[in-house]
């Protein structure tokens, strides 16, 4: 742009016209339309989502149609149907390029974002650039290829949670409080609200996940007399947040927040996946990094292994037909899992220290540590946190998977007025996670709202022109803590035109930042002399959905329907054969029965079992994959060898117990 027509601003004599903060509000409905009926609470997670409803004086976490209280944040398409939740996740191995997950890591981001590009390498589905935003390209029913925005996919998950709540309540639901990571920026927050609209929901309030969890923790102790400093450590599937709050007679005041919107259980899974990808390449000379089907199988087993290692010290990772002709089977120990992820575990401690320092507290001032998110079940995470706080044990009183939805449901009850005496005195005072400002001359980040400022907040500052006779100024809005805008994240920009020509430094341009209770930023610039002004809601103007796009997506969302899952008889038949073979092998080699089998019979069984396992390896992948009937026939063959021998052993054992046997091994034990 020409410097004589449009240029940066300079601060005019450092005049700060209005720097006061507006206090938080107890009633989250003040910023939105009046609600009718229940306002549900939805925790829209990276890997799992959860919904809560407040009624009869308490919160109910609602189970889905599979009986589970958390629902996988997965969506899939087949030629005949769309699947959401467990049904989508369960068929992922067979349908990897049409199964979508981790969409929360794409929402509100630019396609060229470094983290988006890093994620895309691990995703089996296709992510394309549309208008600078990451869109998902997928083949839907009848072979039609469509592209979906992250908001649309998120809306499908929100709609599933909405339907779950409606089935439980027996009535239509139109309003929901939806949670987001505390470190989500404006674009991500607005995109989440747009997803709610597409799902047929009014979202009167966006609430930060750690704050919602603090409500779940603090509700039962609302009557406690003393003030309590609480640190919420929220490590989920894809994001990490830390918030320090003070709880005092129902007042939940966030003192500071910190975190990483790209750190969580998915990253731990990927470290394990990378480990096994290297192992497969070393053992079989094949790189499966670009094989979507193999990665899908590996991803599922790595997640299962991670969960198991929170309860046990080692787990067997077994994958049938990882690729053609190869079944994968390796042991993963807790020690190896911790070694692969130790730097990520330790990375979470930095934001903890930062949040405590920003709250102007010391470690010893923290009264309670509340763990939220499924990844906090990892023993090493708990151990590192305990060490950091000199042996202080985290609170175990709340369910880490459900606490966020619980708190969101409480906030929903406040908005709807259904909370009653239990919630009427609750006051939420949240903060901005990052500093907000504009670019001034020389690329300087001029800060208007510092991080951890209580919201809602409104601040104004007067700037002036940089060039003589400048008639247009460009307002560039950034968030971040660095002194130069090149090191911060641009949120949006707009131009204020029609400024009367004058020497530099004469015009007075007042810029006002206002952050609402949802953490969404609104910016206004006005020429004080001419009375001309312009304003925008900052939601990453380069990638924000237009109202027309949202309306179209709402219509398309209404066309999809929930359908049935695919049955996998062949896998069941294979598993029956494999389970029988390993059970018989255990009987031959271990336990009290092994000594009661004669040498000839043992040799016959070992031979049949070994042959069956070799047959499984040879007929389980590619063109040689066996069918259901083949597995059943092989099982009959093995049973014909092993069955009579085992029956004879049981018969002898029965005779021996009657005193009639002469088994040499009776007294071995």
From Swiss-Prot:
A Gene Ontology molecular function term of the record: ATP hydrolysis activity
Subcellular location as annotated: Endoplasmic reticulum
Signal sequence region: 1-28
GO biological process, one term: protein refolding
Annotated motif Prevents secretion from ER, positions: 666-669
Main location: endoplasmic reticulum
InterPro entries noted in UniProt: ATPase_NBD, BIP_NBD, Heat_shock_70_CS, HSP70_C_sf, HSP70_peptide-bd_sf, Hsp_70_fam
GO cellular component, one term: cytoplasm
Induction: By dithiothreitol-induced endoplasmic reticulum (ER) stress response. Induced by tunicamycin-induced ER stress response.
Pfam families, alphabetized: HSP70
Keyword annotations: ATP-binding, Chaperone, Endoplasmic reticulum, Nucleotide-binding, Signal, Stress response
Family, per entry: Belongs to the heat shock protein 70 family.
PANTHER family in the record: HEAT SHOCK PROTEIN 70KDA
Free-text function comment from the UniProt entry: Functions as a chaperone during endoplasmic reticulum (ER) stress response.
Name of the protein in its database record: Heat shock 70 kDa protein BIP2
Species assigned in the record: Oryza sativa subsp. japonica
